[in-house]
From Swiss-Prot:
Name of the protein this chain belongs to: Large ribosomal subunit protein bL32
GO MF, any single term: structural constituent of ribosome
GO cellular component term of the entry, any: large ribosomal subunit
Segments for region (Disordered): 1-60
Family: Belongs to the bacterial ribosomal protein bL32 family.
Provenance organism: Psychrobacter sp. (strain PRwf-1)
Highest rank taxon of the organism: Bacteria
Length: 60
């Protein structure tokens, strides 16, 4: 079984974890509706790249 020779310091542990952060999702603005949405995802209204793929559900 693999066992480390000596304990890793807090500094080395934290340096290793420095890349484990969440990235901010890039947002685009839809040309048709002007609504912000995630890149390569459709808007809540059902628009993607200027076309309406799905009709928006009406919740009352």
């Amino acid at each position: 079984m693999a066992v480390q020779k000596s304990r890793k310091s807090r500094s080395r542990r934290d340096m290793r974890r420095s890349h484990h952060h969440m990235e901010v999702a890039e947002l685009s603005i839809d040309a048709t509706t002007g609504e912000k949405h995630r890149r390569h995802h459709m808007t809540k209204d059902g628009f993607y790249r200027g076309r309406q793929l799905f009709k928006a559900s009406q919740e009352d």
